[in-house]
Amino acid sequence: MTPKNKPNFQKQPSFVPNYLFGFVVFVIFSNGFCNSDIQKGYKLTLAVPAEYSLGFIGRAFLIETDQTAPNFRAAVSVEAVNGKFSCSLEVLLGDVKVWNSGHYSRFYVSEKCVLELTKDGDLRLKGPNDRVGWLSGTSRQGVERLQILRTGNLVLVDVVNRVKWQSFNFPTDVMLWGQRLNVATRLTSFRGNSTEFYSFEIQRYRIALFLHSGKLNYSYWEFKPSKNRNISFIALGSNGLGLFNDKGKKIAHIYSQRLQPLRFLSLGNRTGNLALYHYSANDRNFQASFQAINKTCDLPLGCKPCEICTFTNSCSCIGLLTKKEKDKSDCGCGEIAVGFCGRNRVEMLELEGVGSVLRDGPKMVNVSKEECASMCTSDCKCVGVLYSSAELECFFYGVVMGVKQVEKRSGLIYMVKVAKGTQRGRGKRNLKKWVLILVGVVDGLIIVLVFGGLAYYLIRRRRKKSLACDNSS
């Protein structure tokens, strides 16, 4: 087991403007720039570069709200992603992307990206040869124009301003001020190439954050109304997030920790943290007013898979790496047996004083530690278990993520499945001590370095004062 650098997690103080990474592109348009609305029959063509350029973002702004900056703007965007160019319709608050048509499924194009509000009222994104990659599905519903409201809601309306389609009905990873999300709705992080992604879900009895890995789902944060009251919907106000019942009465509230009015709620694509944001006029950016999780080790991926997040917020490998894997910068999952089972093939490595932030997985109650370990070795989908000696509970995991160091007196024991014979020659007891002692040594070294540096600074300062007194006398 080797110590790693501290996890790459920082408090989310602000959003960096997207234009820092963008480039100017040539835009052909037919009805002007940033109108108050777009009428049916409108068509805009955004040129796509011939050669791929990493970090490229090109936008043509269509309509905007008449508010003090930062205001809402709708744009057609071409973005360089995974060696291709993605075409999308998006809404921005200042320079922060708050809605995107390609959040769940990207539309890749070459040569051009076309936005069209057809004469029969359908809003479409098209590529070469009129290939349609996204549409509103509002054909022949009386749609007359596209507007963006002061709330940031992008809407298609008919001649009497009845809404036929709205972006608020298709939430992505952001919830705006004034927006309402009903029970069974969720926000999701952008998946990208990873098999892991996060979600913020509104359930009948709670709101919760989830980690999704393949077909596996685990919660890692939740907030419940008192007295087991049921939730009907949530709404974001100026001073926090409100939870409401079926009668529209507020039953719980998550308050902002700043005086400035809130503008949006966001689910972090990298960390999976949930945060409320306000706009700082002095710094000219958005800053976090509240975060659901404030400790690195309480994040599901505060450390990489098969790493332990320690008390000092550093990451340590669980161990059992081959020589080839030790030479790599990443821990990897070494000899952890994924997809294997049977007592003749696998055994359990026991880590005392180690727990997990992941919840809601399968569990068994009133079982012994030995029974807990045996059930995992017999289950090919199980790679680890968390056993509580106090509650006699056994929690089963299909991933080794969200693992963190806990107090030994908590009575928690984390066990991972390894190939049979991995512990041979060391003995189970010695191997367990080896893993935990190394975690303790890493933390101890950090503490010694901090206090040693402080002592050195104080001694140097005292010597300088003594020399100054001698010179003056």
Regions found by a protein language model. Give the residues of each.
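Beta-rich ligand-binding surfaces for carbohydrates and other polyanions
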Residues: 2-473
